[in-house]
Amino acid sequence: MCIRDREYNMQYLRRLVWYIASRLLVITLVLGLMVTGFYYAMNVTNINVVLKDGMARRAQVIMMTEDSSELTKYFQESFIQRDPQVQNAIAGYSAYKDYNIRGMDHRLEMSFFWVWPWDTVARVTIVERIPRIDGRVKGAYADQYVAEQGASALYPPAWQSMKYNAILVKESGKWHIRSLTVVEALAN
């Protein structure tokens, strides 16, 4: 009888251990998925903010001659040095230099992308559009522009809509845009 009781007790002990182990495994898997989901959402949100704010700031530097030192919050310094539109704006050769730009309607669309919590590089396809620019030619140039190009020259030229492949890198816990490669120029 004693051996039978021990086997009977061992059977219940084994069932109890397997029950606890299976529940711990399920809880661990659920917690792992929650942590992965949290870090995915955090990375996607940070990348979204960096791209939207960075591309808007880039357009402001090009059109409104804003301070270009703000771009380092969003872009790597090496990219800023290679970006011809930003460099032309800094040098005073922007197509918008003779215009007082008061505002713009900046729009950025992003495709779906996946970033694992441990990833330090992200690739995103974006479409940048600026359908409306609020501004006029500076007073000193108004008569000259109207004489040379007609009345439509009083308003700033349209921004070329583009589709880009953007590569972002995570440096010191912050995402920065490393490169923008033009995929295609889009109709405005």
Question: What are the roles of these predicted feature ranges?
Answer:
Residues 36-111, 115-116:
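Core segments of small alpha/beta cavity-forming domains
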